[in-house]
A protein has these predicted regions:
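GT-A fold catalytic core of metal-dependent nucleotide-sugar glycosyltransferases
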Residues: 1-28, 42, 49-60
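A short secondary-structure junction signal
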Residues: 5-9, 31-35, 60-65, 141
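A short, conserved beta-to-alpha structural element at the edge of catalytic cores
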Residues: 16-40, 139, 143-147
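A glycosyltransferase accessory/donor-loop signature
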Residues: 46-162
Length: 162
């Protein structure tokens, strides 16, 4: 994941009483999938970038709820913690613009199916780039990865010593 812009607006966001804010999963929003958990009928977020209202988490013992959910669902979920989070926060999360968690794997997914118009690569660099799926910039055996040049720009940057 690469952050390319200030997170000031995100960190000062009015969460309107929601315990989490996230971006809808770009692929799962467009395909029908059925698993032992009933999440295919409600919006499902990608947990790679999650904004949490920690006051609410403490007041509502969210950590305990997540642990109980994980214990109950155990191996029955395809996306681990993401499914646990979506189960606990089902219909109780604030949806953010997709640029706050631009999921590169979605571009590849829809291109392979000749459906690029469903999820096109944006013309401008998003504030948060999430290199989803197995296609990672540091693994050279994958084809074209959206915004791979941004990853390498930050990787090769001359960072100050701490």
């Amino acid at each position: 994941m690469v952050v390319t812009q200030s997170l000031h607006d995100l960190l000062n966001l009015d969460m309107r009483g929601y315990p989490v804010a996230a971006v809808q999963d770009s692929v799962l929003a467009h395909i029908e999938w059925k698993y032992p958990i009933d999440l295919h009928t409600t919006p499902y977020f990608n947990s790679g970038m999650l904004l949490a209202d920690l006051v609410q988490w403490r007041e509502h013992n969210i950590a305990v709820q997540l642990l109980k959910t994980a214990a109950c669902l155990n191996e029955a979920v395809p996306y681990g913690n993401q499914c646990f989070l979506n189960t606990v926060f089902q219909k109780n999360w604030l949806q953010l613009e997709e640029s706050w968690n631009f999921q590169t794997g979605a571009v590849e997914y829809f291109q392979k199916r000749n459906l690029s118009e469903v999820f096109p690569k944006p013309d401008t660099v998003p504030p948060v780039i999430h290199y989803t799926t197995r296609a990672k910039p540091w693994l050279c055996d994958y084809g074209e990865i959206p915004f791979i040049e941004v990853y390498w720009q930050y990787y090769c940057a001359d960072w100050p010593k701490a």
